[in-house]
């Protein structure tokens, strides 16, 4: 364990209210390892339909090639997760505030469905550090792309997985065979039994992720990247406050523009979806703002005529940006998936 990475892990774990964390080479590495740490060929997970395009591609294609099925549930109704669950379901997965529709995920509702069954909820909290605390609402695992808000400057790629230490992995041992059956690569160790004895903490998930998946994939975070990200972490609270304030001003301005058909923001939704934003986000509703200008051509024209904003994809760094998700970050999705 590198000491610089160790400092970053402890600080992000503290930020999230978790017990332990493991840094990895990127946010996508964090996502992949979270799933591979619980699921193997023949297993499945249930994931939200509201996800980053790269994650959808990972789930639909790469994990499928490894024999892991990902079933997609519309989070508008949390019961959709239960409907897709069977004896081979190893995890539920969602994003706290998914881009571009910004419909806040029903964290407690889905976590409460999974916990009695022995199914942990994994939340990607990349878009809402500080203002959203998934572990406090029942999520078992939180992950981030450190490249975004926590790093904050667009200088370093990294990812992290935080173990909440709040999930009873022994409740249904058959549900999680990778944690509850002997691991031959470690002399037959059973993670759920061995880790608490060695560490005094309920963190078999993150320990196995570190000593098995990080070992086998070779995707650690570079110590220099960790050092740069630590610099960003020191100001993330102040930056998120300003991000949220700026976004609210942008929303107010866009709502006065006749050519803007719809303004997308967590609190601009109606009904239960808006209530979730109010319930799960405190101190602001994030920096992401979406708008509908009618057609793909209008969107391209808008982007091409920007003078101050950058046309880049890395949210949460020092630059203000604008992007058309359907032709960039979500370009590998088909029309039906884009509409979902």
Stretch-by-stretch model annotation:
Residues 1-16:
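Aromatic- and Gly/Pro-rich amphipathic surface segment
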Residues 20-256, 264:
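Conserved PLP-enzyme active-site core in the AAT-like
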Residues 1, 105-106, 147-154, 225, ...:
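Solvent-exposed, flexible loop/coil residues
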Residues 15, 254-258, 306:
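Acidic-histidine catalytic/liganding microenvironments
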Residues 10, 252, 300:
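Active-site phosphate/pyrophosphate- and oxyanion-stabilizing loops and adjacent acidic/basic residues
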Residues 240, 248, 259-340:
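Conserved C-terminal alpha-helix-loop-beta "cap" of PLP-dependent enzymes
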